[in-house]
Amino acid sequence: MVATCLQVVGFVTSFVGWIGVIVTTSTNDWVVTCGYTIPTCRKLDELGSKGLWADCVMATGLYHCKPLVDILILPGYVQACRALMIAASVLGLPAILLLLTVLPCIRMGQEPGVAKYRRAQLAGVLLILLALCALVATIWFPVCAHRETTIVSFGYSLYAGWIGAVLCLVGGCVILCCAGDAQAFGENRFYYTAGSSSPTHAKSAHV
């Protein structure tokens, strides 16, 4: 029963974390920047935001973004962080699909528990790789951006990325280390048989 609960917890945690990583990858509010001194920017109400795909300016209620489409002039760290976040987002899809197939409520014929166990282990490894890619990108980007411009604060995209990466790391570790062995993945299968002298149904465990 404990192993079953941990499998579900690992799946839910990983799924929420993966969504956070996708949000981080697709949005541009990674860091809030200032082209002048911070007091001047606050007085002029002019702040910017920098992300993987665009540089944006917020001034007097207006929000304008300039897409970063010229790959040849982009800093190397931006291109590397793009690659890492895209890889993290892509790795999440097979990991979540594999976890779906090993949930206790999912049955794929009469497969042995060891097959589910191997898929769960593969999903756990993918989730940890996902988390590492996201963590490297979301730490590397603000460090390098700080060398180019003044950073006022971190944006919601970075926070979503950090939370998502940590959740995926926790989910992957739970699946790998705490969700049981091959027997635990095979013991939660049930079938129902009709009683010979009673209209009620008895539940029998099938290991």
UniProtKB/Swiss-Prot annotation:
GO terms for cellular component: axon; basal part of cell; bicellular tight junction; cell junction; lipid droplet; neurofilament; plasma membrane; tight junction. Plays a major role in tight junction-specific obliteration of the intercellular space, through calcium-independent cell-adhesion activity. It comes from the Eukaryota. The lineage of its organism: Eukaryota, Metazoa, Chordata, Craniata, Vertebrata. InterPro entries: Claudin, Claudin11, Claudin_CS, PMP22/EMP/MP20/Claudin. Residues 1, 104-122, 179-207 are cytoplasmic. Belongs to the claudin family. Its main location: other. Interacts with tetraspanin-3/TSPAN3. Interacts with OCLN. Residues 23-82, 144-157 are extracellular. The keyword Cell division does not apply. Disulfide bonds: none annotated. GO terms for biological process: axon ensheathment; bicellular tight junction assembly; calcium-independent cell-cell adhesion via plasma membrane cell-adhesion molecules; cell adhesion; spermatogenesis; tight junction assembly. One of its GO terms (molecular function) is identical protein binding. It comes from Homo sapiens (Human). The chain crosses the membrane at residues 2-22, 83-103, 123-143, 158-178. It is found in: Cell junction, Tight junction; Cell membrane. It holds the Pfam family PMP22_Claudin. This is Claudin-11. The keyword Membrane applies. Keywords: Cell junction, Cell membrane, Leukodystrophy, Membrane, Phosphoprotein, Tight junction, Transmembrane, Transmembrane helix. It is a multi-pass membrane protein.
